[in-house]
């Protein structure tokens, strides 16, 4: 949608970053959010895998870990809406809580593996 608002033309394929300057403000925020989502995924995915491995070896993890695993993706959806909608306080709260969820998964997964 942001490309259509930036009057996308085929010649823009030669220099896609130059077209970015013509994006509307919400389009730029959507692009930044997209990049940030990759960064968040690289932190959360290993935590989720660690928790899964711990659960397979030691049995079910505490409810807190399960809640954190489900809460993080939900928070990312709210984060995306807040980022594109330019609502920084909600965006910051979602980011911090999502980071906490990943931390909980790392903590509970390591605790289960080391104690089990």
What residues fall within each predicted segment?
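Juxtamembrane boundary at the C-terminal end of a transmembrane helix
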Residues: 105-116
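Cytosolic, membrane-interface loops and tails of multi-pass inner-membrane proteins
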Residues: 1-31
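Alpha-helical transmembrane segments
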Residues: 44, 48, 100, 104-107
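Alpha-helical transmembrane segments of multi-pass membrane proteins
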Residues: 72-76
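Juxtamembrane "helix exit" motif at the C-terminal ends of alpha-helical transmembrane segments
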Residues: 47-60, 110
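Core segments of transmembrane alpha-helices
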Residues: 35-51
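Structural signature of hydrophobic alpha-helical transmembrane segments
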Residues: 61-71
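Interfacial loop-to-transmembrane junctions
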Residues: 77-100
């Amino acid at each position: 949608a942001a490309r259509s608002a930036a009057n996308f033309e085929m010649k823009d394929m030669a220099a896609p970053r130059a077209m970015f300057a013509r994006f509307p403000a919400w389009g730029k925020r959507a692009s930044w959010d997209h990049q940030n989502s990759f960064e968040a995924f690289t932190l959360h995915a290993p935590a989720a895998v660690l928790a899964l491995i711990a659960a397979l070896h030691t049995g079910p993890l505490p409810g807190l870990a399960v809640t954190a695993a489900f809460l993080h993706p939900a928070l990312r959806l709210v984060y995306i809406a807040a980022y594109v909608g330019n609502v920084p306080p909600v965006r910051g709260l979602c980011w911090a809580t999502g980071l906490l969820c990943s931390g909980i998964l790392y903590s509970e997964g390591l605790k289960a593996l080391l104690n089990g």
